[in-house]
């Protein structure tokens, strides 16, 4: 029951006074169908008391969509009467978002018997964008289910601002550190290396649009809740959105020349990388290829070996006009780009320039050893 209570009620972040924000997602009441109201309310308040101390001030946020599982009015009245003095006294504000007709009737009936002081703390909001005016989303981490429903209310949380600098189009050469979207995406994937189809499967377009908008506007993102496939889609989007691709046309042309040169491939490739890729691009390549290497170490579970990964994520690293030809399955063993990608996955640790500050962002899989020097 504790796990379900954590999905129903949790600390979502902090308000402008740095006090805790308790988030309640009433849609998740459906997890408690087998419990009667009295026991549910008792366990819920026990759970809340673990989240906040009796002398702590806090803000409450209720997401009330699809909240018709129980007799909502009866449940609301029992919850109000079961609320202890400290919870009642210390709540600073109660925001109710995405209300349906049943929750509106229930809450308005409840407030008719509540004290005027308590009633004044309630505020009804239509959408997450309205909530953002009172509690910035940079302070809140909300679950996917809330954002999914909000898309039925508004097409976007933030107004379009073409003049704003997007996290996804900032030149790599100007980065002082990897963007949060990449770092957190890699962390989520590294925790789920056994998931089948990493970088091959795609998440829903709705989920991808949501996480892009949140990262692009400096919000907290519970990316782990969206899942590893969404994290992979986000990473691919980031690389596709770079002003200059990770691997330039010059680099791709050089792959063919160096492959046919008769010189030792490792030596030839290293010279090409040093000549064609700036330091930040090499550090970025080192990050992503370290993750791809980790994925290959679980290929029996995730069905993604170096060859599959090269075919699935390779197009995101280049904007070449002939990318389809570059990624062709025909004569794959002689395909310079595919051959390079597979080689880079296996030898990332020695191939690309490293820097301690950037290497600290590489997610660590303790079950693996670093690849050996070729």
From Swiss-Prot:
One of its GO terms (molecular function) is phospholipid transfer activity. It comes from Schizosaccharomyces pombe (strain 972 / ATCC 24843). Keywords: Golgi apparatus, GTPase activation. The record marks 200 as: Arginine finger. One of its GO terms (cellular component) is cytoplasm. The lineage of its organism: Eukaryota, Fungi, Dikarya, Ascomycota, Taphrinomycotina. GO terms for biological process: intermembrane phospholipid transfer; small GTPase-mediated signal transduction. PROSITE patterns: RHOGAP (PS50238). It is found in: Golgi apparatus. Residues 170-352 form the Rho-GAP domain. This is Putative Rho GTPase-activating protein C1565.02c. InterPro entries: CRAL-TRIO_dom (IPR001251), CRAL-TRIO_dom_sf (IPR036865), Rho_GTPase_activation_prot (IPR008936), RhoGAP_dom (IPR000198).
């Amino acid at each position: 029951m504790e796990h379900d209570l954590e999905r129903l009620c949790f600390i979502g972040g902090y308000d402008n006074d740095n006090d805790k924000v308790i988030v309640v997602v009433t849609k998740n009441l459906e997890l408690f169908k087998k419990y009667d109201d009295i026991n549910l309310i008792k366990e819920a308040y026990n759970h809340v008391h673990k989240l906040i101390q009796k002398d702590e001030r806090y803000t409450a946020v209720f997401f009330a969509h699809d909240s018709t599982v129980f007799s909502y009015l009866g449940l609301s009245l029992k919850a109000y009467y079961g609320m202890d003095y400290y919870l009642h006294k210390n709540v600073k504000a109660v925001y109710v978002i995405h209300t349906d007709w049943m929750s509106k009737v229930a809450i308005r009936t409840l407030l008719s018997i509540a004290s005027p002081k308590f009633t004044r703390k309630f505020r009804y909001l239509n959408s997450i964008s309205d909530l953002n005016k009172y509690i910035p989303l940079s302070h809140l981490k909300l679950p996917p289910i809330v954002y999914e429903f909000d898309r039925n209310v508004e097409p976007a949380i933030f107004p379009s601002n073409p003049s704003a600098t997007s996290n996804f189009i900032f030149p790599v050469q100007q980065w002082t550190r990897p963007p949060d979207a990449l770092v957190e995406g890699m962390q989520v994937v590294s925790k789920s290396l056994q998931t089948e189809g990493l970088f091959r499967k795609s998440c829903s377009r709705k989920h991808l649009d949501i996480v892009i908008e949140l990262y692009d506007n400096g919000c907290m993102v519970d990316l782990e809740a969206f899942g590893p496939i969404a994290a992979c889609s986000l990473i691919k989007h980031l690389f596709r959105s770079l002003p200059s691709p990770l691997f330039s046309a010059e680099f791709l042309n050089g792959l063919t020349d160096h492959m046919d040169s008769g010189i030792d491939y490792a030596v030839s490739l290293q010279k090409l990388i040093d000549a064609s890729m700036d330091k930040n691009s090499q550090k970025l390549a080192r990050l992503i290829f370290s993750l791809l290497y980790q994925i290959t170490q679980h290929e029996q579970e995730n069905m993604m070996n170096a060859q599959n990964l090269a075919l699935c994520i390779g197009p995101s690293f280049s904007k070449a006009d002939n990318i389809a030809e570059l990624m062709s399955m025909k004569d794959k063993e002689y395909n310079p780009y595919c051959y390079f990608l597979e080689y880079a996955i296996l030898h990332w640790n020695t191939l690309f320039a490293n820097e301690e500050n950037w290497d600290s962002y590489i997610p660590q899989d303790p079950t693996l050893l670093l690849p050996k020097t070729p």
